[in-house]
């Protein structure tokens, strides 16, 4: 692993990502059980907003970590945060489908931003593959909720969550 990587900052970012992944998994299960309409409910909107609130601190920690290929993160993460914020606001204010589509679009940048984390940690920990594969599966599975088939996103998020937990454990040694 790059000797200039700030391990504690990476661990802090991973911890925030774990909290987000747990909250996302809970939301994904509810969306599968109650349908996409759940995203328009007050509790669904609050859950999505709380998840969104975790993205700036996670991004801050990752920005300060000296990751390899950090430019990928520094471009993709703010795009993800901004597009998702617009989608959340649009969903909350209009209840229109475009809002959810923007949220899904914003989340397409999440695994792209995660490439910097993956490239930094892959030699140190093969479990980083779980993280990145899970992130891509989760993201690619999100549009399937529009067809009442959210299982790929749930499995992807669970794999990503497992990878994050293993990475934290390995880095904390």
Regions found by a protein language model. Name each.
Residues 1-173:
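Hydrophobic, aromatic-enriched alpha-helical segments typical of multi-pass transmembrane helices
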